[in-house]
């Protein structure tokens, strides 16, 4: 279960224990989208005056900035990998 409190993305891995894992560290993170296999979360974040995409594993061990060609990134979503 994912919930967003003050735009800080958290994961609740064990609803019985209520334990949480903080996956982002600013109030400028929003629009999380969980991968179909539940392993990764992609979300938009603000860096300076631009929106960027951030990728983080559900356990918080892996974090990456996804490069873009500029512009504003909002509402990321997962889609199937297509080959020609």
From Swiss-Prot:
The keyword Cell inner membrane does not apply. The keyword Cell cycle applies. Pfam families: PD40. InterPro entries: 6-blade_b-propeller_TolB-like, PD40. The Tol-Pal system is composed of five core proteins: the inner membrane proteins TolA, TolQ and TolR, the periplasmic protein TolB and the outer membrane protein Pal. They form a network linking the inner and outer membranes and the peptidoglycan layer. Belongs to the TolB family. This is Tol-Pal system protein TolB. It comes from Actinobacillus pleuropneumoniae (Haemophilus pleuropneumoniae). The lineage of its organism: Bacteria, Pseudomonadati, Pseudomonadota, Gammaproteobacteria, Pasteurellales.
């Amino acid at each position: 279960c994912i919930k967003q409190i003050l735009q800080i993305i958290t994961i609740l891995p064990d609803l019985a224990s209520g334990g949480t894992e903080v996956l982002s560290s600013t109030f400028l993170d929003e629009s999380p989208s969980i991968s179909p296999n539940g392993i990764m979360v992609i979300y938009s974040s603000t860096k300076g005056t631009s929106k960027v995409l951030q990728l983080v594993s559900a356990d918080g061990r892996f974090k990456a900035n996804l490069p873009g060609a500029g512009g504003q990134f909002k509402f990321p979503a997962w889609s199937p990998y297509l080959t020609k």
